[in-house]
């Protein structure tokens, strides 16, 4: 009987520890979200003259993605819904999912996923990056980050997604360098923000 009480106590302590760990992760996500949302936004509106000196492919990109007179924004909040594959290519095991993301190019992002039994977040700031997912809301099944390779990957995601959601972040300015590759290709180099 004592062993049963001991095991029950250990199980309760483990569940409490996992719940506290999840709470700490959610607080980190919320603080990061709030910090990204509070970043200053550029002022003014898009004027084609802003890109007149860029290589022709870059200029065409901006003229296609930002209408003249559009307010310049480098942060976007994106709501997603649909299905996510949790299986293999042959048997994708699609599950309903909902997600939300804040993307503040180039400062970082937080992506929060709820796919029923699986949930968690990806994120990046100037100081850190992470991927954290849990089974049943408690049991960690993926927990990586806080290393240079993960950070580079997360920063690449910020830049890639930013080209669709926050093109104003790539207008000429500090940390942005455009160069022509050929008549139909331009390359942008984006400097990561210092912590």
List the predicted regions and their residue ranges.
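N-terminal type II signal-anchor transmembrane helix
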Residues: 1-30
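Charged, low-complexity, helix-prone segments enriched in Lys/Glu/Asp/Gln
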Residues: 21-37, 58, 120, 151-158, ...
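Bulky hydrophobic/aromatic packing residues
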Residues: 22, 61, 105-113, 164-166, ...
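Short, compositionally biased low-complexity segments
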Residues: 24-41, 125-137
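N-terminal leader/targeting segments and the immediate start of mature chains
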Residues: 28-77
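Residue-level preference for alpha-helix termini and adjacent loops
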Residues: 45, 50-53, 60-61, 83, ...
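N-terminal mature ectodomain segment of secretory-pathway/periplasmic proteins
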Residues: 59-138
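Flexible, processing/modification-adjacent segments and terminal tails
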Residues: 133-194
């Amino acid at each position: 009987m004592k062993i049963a009480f001991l095991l029950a106590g250990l199980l309760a302590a483990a569940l409490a520890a996992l719940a506290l760990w999840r709470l700490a992760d959610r607080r980190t996500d919320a603080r990061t979200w709030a910090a990204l949302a509070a970043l200053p936004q550029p002022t003014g509106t898009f004027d084609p003259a802003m890109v007149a000196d860029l290589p022709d492919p870059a200029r065409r990109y901006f003229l296609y993605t930002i209408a003249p007179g559009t307010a310049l924004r480098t942060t976007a909040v994106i709501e997603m819904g649909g299905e996510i594959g949790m299986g293999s290519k042959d048997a994708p095991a699609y599950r309903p999912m909902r997600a939300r993301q804040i993307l503040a190019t180039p400062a970082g992002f937080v992506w929060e996923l709820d796919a029923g039994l699986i949930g968690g977040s990806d994120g990046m700031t100037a100081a850190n990056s992470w991927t954290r997912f849990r089974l049943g809301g408690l049991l960690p099944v993926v927990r990586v980050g806080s290393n240079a390779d993960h950070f580079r990957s997360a920063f690449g995601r910020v830049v890639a997604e930013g080209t669709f959601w926050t093109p104003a972040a790539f207008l000429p300015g500090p940390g942005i360098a455009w160069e022509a590759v050929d008549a139909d290709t331009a390359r942008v180099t984006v400097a990561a923000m210092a912590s």
